[in-house]
Amino acid sequence: MTTNDDDHAAERNTMSMNYELAATLSDEEQRARKGKAKIVCKEEDHVFIKKKEKYEEESEKREFFSHVPRKIRPALRYPQPNFENPNGASSSLNLPFEEDYYMAEYYKKTETINPPNPYHQWSPSSFLTEYTHPRMLEVLHRCGFNRPVVTCYSRTAREMRWWLRQVMKDMRAEDLTLILEKTLSTTDVITTTHGRFSMHFNRLISNDFLKPEERSILEEDTYNDETMGVGAILVDQRSQKWSVILKRWGQNYFLSCGWNDVVKANKLKAGDDICLWAFRCDGVLCFAMRQWRGILCFALVPPLTLRQSSSSNARRLC
């Protein structure tokens, strides 16, 4: 009996010791886990605090620069002297408005020096390009100015500049304008039936080469077979002069009354390329024409001189 009781007591002591050991191990394991978890939380808190400080610093920088207006870079700038602040420390807040004012004044001066011709007629064959920069279009639209138009000449027209410079130098002329680029048709060189050189309005690169009084003369005589038109003198490369008449019929200008002599003397034929230029010489409208094998020039007689002349003299030229 005593042995059995001792065995039971020893077994109970062993079990209690095992329970205590297991509890101790479990408690230590839990404490170890809690301690490691606390360390991880501290590291995460430190990283989060650093990120927060960096974000706050960047936010302060952005808020600081948000109060400073950015400089706008327009396509074109026309600087003007600042009389209010000669040291150059002008306010940047008024910069866009100052740019608009300066650019608007520039185009206003340009239009004042070279006013648009009210008689100008657009033609689909003209080579025209426009400024398309958004900043410039916005400024021009806000200030009420039309977009400037730039005429682009063809390669043939550009190659003739050297010759035109010499012609204008000899004649002391100015205001050179390209009017027409055309290939002569059969009707332009037939001397038996037509006897005229036609210039259709839709083929004109520029239709503002006539003065108002010259244009009114041609408009009054439109669809009139007995019109005198505007007298002209045609000069070829041999300095030989020919009397011609500039007329209008419908939507065409014509050179007649002497054109047949020009065709025969210069041996013009269908297929020859013609470039016609206009310029002013002492206030008189002049033209310069060049074809494949030669150079032709003619100058319009002032309309007042033509009106003073009798109709019989004009018919005699034909």
Swiss-Prot record:
User: Where is this chain primarily localised?
Assistant: nucleus
Q: Which UniProt keywords apply?
A: DNA-binding, Nucleus, Transcription, Transcription regulation
- Could you tell me which PROSITE patterns the record lists for this protein? B3
Q: Tell me which InterPro entries the record gives.
A: At2g31720-like, B3_DNA-bd, DNA-bd_pseudobarrel_sf
Instruction: Name any GO cellular component annotation.
Output: nucleus
SUPFAM superfamilies from the entry?
DNA-binding pseudobarrel domain
List the GO molecular function terms. Answer: DNA binding
Which residue ranges does UniProt annotate as crossing the membrane?
A: none
Query: DNA binding happens at which residues?
Result: 201-293
Per the record, the coiled-coil ranges are: none
Where in or outside the cell?
Nucleus
Q: What protein name is recorded for this chain?
A: B3 domain-containing protein At1g05930
